[in-house]
Amino acid sequence: MFQSKNIKNFLKNRFRGFYPVVIDVETAGFDPYRDALLEIAIITLRMDDNGFLRIDNKLHFNIIPTPGLNIKKSALKFNKIDPYNPFRAAINERKAIKEIFNTVRLGIKKQSCSKAVVVAHNAYFDHSFLMSAVDRSKIKYNPFHSFSTFDTATLSGLVLGQTVLSKACIIAGIEFNNNYAHSALYDSKKTAELFCEIVNRWKKMGGWPIPKNRK
């Protein structure tokens, strides 16, 4: 895992000690406590020597629907997921969350950060499904902040005048193929590219770092 050698450009100094982790989930409905999680992907970020945010590591898991949770046909029609397809190579929810948390903890330690923070497009949705899965899995230590997030829908609305992921990416000059949309891995990658573009654009415009006399 790469870390900038320039102390001024350490990731921990950019987001008040938070370690940003891009997340996307695909689900069997909109209720994080009643509807099943079907797919989850994360992308960790790093900062290069020039202080620009870059994509680092990726993790993606297809999830076996947790017994007792709803699987709504309307959701499956939308995301085109067959939750019982054996070729999905799906794993149970708890195992996936533990693998993700192990990767995130290593990143937090490597980057000398204090806590991970979810970065997502319409972040409340992804954050709530993640937290619900953690509760069901009875995992004691959660490296993610319990409520703070970075929402790229809000950020892109401010910076680009668009809140839909595909439209925001196109305006930002990021290629987006709708044929691959609603895959957790693809959407997380595009969300990561969008977040990096917005953060880096702000830096290029002189918005970061903040002048010492304003700190």
From Swiss-Prot:
GO molecular function annotations of the record: 3'-5' exonuclease activity; magnesium ion binding; nucleic acid binding; RNA exonuclease activity, producing 5'-phosphomonoesters
E.C. numbers: 3.1.13.-
SMART domains, A to Z: EXOIII
Binding annotation for Mg(2+) 2: D24, E26, H182, D187
Annotated positions binding Mg(2+) 1: D24
Catalytic residues as annotated in Swiss-Prot or TrEMBL: H182 (proton donor/acceptor)
An example Gene Ontology biological process: tRNA processing
GO cellular component term of the entry, any: cytosol
Domain of life: Bacteria
Site note Important for substrate binding and specificity, residues: F30, F78, F125, F147
Domain Exonuclease: 21-195
Cofactor info, note text: Binds two Mg(2+) per subunit. The active form of the enzyme binds two Mg(2+) ions in its active site. The first Mg(2+) forms only one salt bridge with the protein.
Cofactor requirement: Mg(2+)
Disulfide bond entries: none
Protein family (similarity comment): Belongs to the RNase T family.
Chain's role: Trims short 3' overhangs of a variety of RNA species, leaving a one or two nucleotide 3' overhang. Responsible for the end-turnover of tRNA: specifically removes the terminal AMP residue from uncharged tRNA (tRNA-C-C-A). Also appears to be involved in tRNA biosynthesis.
NCBIfam families (alphabetical): RNaseT
Assembly, per entry: Homodimer.
The protein's name: Ribonuclease T
